[in-house]
């Protein structure tokens, strides 16, 4: 594993089911630089709730010809490789990933992850720790909230700044990291 490298990940779902991924965005960060991005719409093969559409703006017709998760997942894993994954509110995103992998009948990969929301709560003094509020805390421009690629970029920028308070990324993953396999 490269010393200071990680992948920031974000999902949007079509409805309340954790298996209804309709968009995925990821950014790879190596030595404090975003080096690669990954973004795709995903056909959830499920209904869209009006509540979720209001959040992310993705309509059923937007994903009609999009690949399904079983097609996208191998490309996601190739992008992630052996890097740790970070998500802002990882409890949601990692449950989405875990349940979607189970739904397509594949084994859960050995994947280390941590949560930038929880790391922020342990690291900085802010009145709120949501993605938008942390971007404001660090005085960073933030446009397109609930667009998976923009949210993954925001998560990466926040994480990079939070990591400056620690010895290195390995230290953070050893203390706060979890493994997707443990969701069992």
Predicted regions and their residues:
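Short, acidic/small-residue loops that bind anionic groups at enzyme active sites
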Residues: 108-116, 120
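Conserved non-catalytic scaffold segment of RNase H-like nuclease domains
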Residues: 1-111, 125-128, 132-146
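Active-site phosphate/pyrophosphate-handling residues
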Residues: 95, 118, 153
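Short Asp/Glu-rich motifs
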Residues: 72, 120, 154-155
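Acidic, divalent-metal-coordinating active-site segment for phosphoryl/phosphodiester hydrolysis
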Residues: 147-160
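Acidic two-metal-ion nuclease catalytic site recognized across multiple nuclease folds
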Residues: 1, 157-184
